[in-house]
Design a protein with these regions (language model features):
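Active-site-proximal N-terminal segment of extracellular/periplasmic enzymes that hydrolyze or transfer
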Residues: 1-49, 89-90
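Proline-centered helix-kink/hinge sites
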Residues: 4, 29-31, 50, 54, ...
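Short, solvent-exposed turn/loop segments enriched in Gly/Ser/Thr/Pro and often Arg
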Residues: 11, 21-23, 39-61, 76-77, ...
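A conserved catalytic-core signature of glycosyltransferases
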Residues: 30, 54-55, 72, 79
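Catalytic-site neighborhoods of secreted/periplasmic enzymes
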Residues: 61-166
Length: 166
C-alpha cells in the first residue's frame, strides 16, 4: 500500500481568522482555501505555550512546556525528546521543511565550537531542510509584489470589527 503524503502547515503569529475561507474581509488566501476544502482545517486550535519557540516545541514533541522545558525562545530542546519529524522519518516518510522551526540545538550533543551554539534559529531534529525562510523571504516578497500583492496594513487585517470570540 502506498503511503499518503502529508502536508503539515504551521505559521508564526498567524491568527486563525486570517484566512479568506473563514470569512476574513481583506485577506485573500486562495491556495490555502483549496487545501482547507480538501483536507483538515482546525478552526479551534489553541497554542499550548507562549512565546512561539516553546509553542513550536510543544507542537513538535507533543509535550507540555513544563515537560519539554523549552520555556523561552532560545531555550534548547532536550535531545532526549523525540520530535514529530523524527517519528515520521522512522516510519519511512521524508519530512521536508520549508521555513523554520526556531529550535535550539541541545548543547550537550554539540562540540564547543559548533556554530549552532550561537543561534536559536535551528531546525527541529528529523527534518530535511529544503528552504530556510531567511533564504527565501526577499525573493518571495518580490514575487508577490510583481503580482500586485503588497503588505496589508495592520488595521486592514485586525480592524473593521472582524474580531470575534472563539
Amino acid at each position: 500500500m502506498l503511503a499518503m503524503n502529508v502536508l503539515f502547515i504551521t505559521a508564526d503569529q498567524w491568527r486563525g481568522d486570517s484566512l479568506s475561507c473563514v470569512g476574513h474581509p481583506a485577506v485573500r488566501t486562495p491556495v490555502l482555501d483549496r487545501l482547507a476544502a480538501d483536507g483538515v482545517l482546525f478552526t479551534r486550535h489553541y497554542a499550548q505555550a507562549t512565546p512561539c519557540g516553546p509553542s513550536r516545541a510543544s507542537l513538535h514533541t507533543g509535550l507540555y512546556a513544563l515537560n519539554h522545558r523549552s520555556i523561552t525562545n532560545g531555550t534548547p530542546l532536550d535531545s532526549r525528546h523525540r520530535t514529530l519529524a523524527s517519528v515520521v522519518r522512522e516510519a519511512g516518510y521524508d519530512p521536508v521543511l520549508f521555513g523554520y522551526t526556531d529550535t535550539s540545538a541541545d548543547p550537550r550533543r554539540l562540540p564547543p565550537d559548533s556554530p549552532w551554539l550561537r543561534t536559536y534559529e535551528g531546525v527541529a531534529p528529523g527534518f530535511r531542510t529544503e528552504l530556510r525562510v531567511t533564504e527565501a523571504e526577499e525573493v518571495y516578497l518580490a514575487h508577490l509584489a510583481e503580482r500586485g500583492y503588497g503588505r496589508l496594513d495592520y488595521a486592514d487585517v485586525y480592524g473593521g470589527g472582524f474580531l470575534r470570540p472563539a
